[in-house]
Amino acid sequence: DLHSFPTRRSSDLEPAESLADDMVTIKAAYDVVNKNPLGSAAGYGSSFPINRTMTTKLLGFADLNYNVVYAQMGRGKAERVVAQSLANVADTLSKLSMDACLYLNQNFGFVHFPAELTTGSSIMPHKKNPDVFELIRSHCNRIKALPNEITLMTTNLPSGYHRDLQLLKEHLFPAFKTLKDCIEMAGLMLSNIEIKKDILSDEKYKYLFSVEEVNKLVNAGIPFRDAYKKIGLDIEAGKFTYQASVAHTHEGSIGNLRF
């Protein structure tokens, strides 16, 4: 984490909880589109005595688009709802990928990946490039633009069917495979991640524990502003001492990550 206080790498499992929320939006999108539009014909229903309930059951839809006009008007909306659910997953993966790229670089060095999952530099033999995560990030950022593309393509269309709607397929359908590939690539990378041990033993991280020392004084009854000032003065005077451990926790924090 980039804030200046200690945490644990398990805190970076937040994408798991984010993906759990993303699944809620995917289920919601599925519920929106799991309705039978057949029988709406050119947009105003059929003059034949068809049984739309029967076709709904035979095709496995959960329900009907009852209003035949809405069955046509829902085109564009259905694609946009699905695209947004895909974009939510893509957003989670792109952020995860950015963090992985950041934590891999030499200024952090928090994580490591096997050589076969990284690429070398064109001129620097010591460097390992996180190309897989960079490609995931780029693909997912493109998917995040998809809801806006669909919104713009369907703006100001009057009720009914229009040939404009045909173009939605070539934007939406490839996104399913792209996102699936990104999920699989992320899974492969994370299954091979290596976390650096004893990161906080590095001298440059000693001031991360300044907050913990302030908290100790506060818990001992010293007002926060006074504790804050004391630790700050100790740091300026070169007298700051600390223990490289954290004594507190709560639900969802260090050592207590459950959901």
What are the roles of these predicted feature ranges?
Residues 1-2, 30, 201:
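Short, surface-exposed helix-loop/turn micro-motifs enriched in polar/charged residues
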Residues 109, 124-259:
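Glycine-rich cofactor/substrate-binding loops
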Residues 9-153:
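Internal glycine-rich alpha/beta core junctions
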Residues 2-10:
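Short, small-residue-biased leader/transition segments that mark boundaries at the very start
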Residues 1-3, 18, 22, 99, ...:
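Acidic side chains
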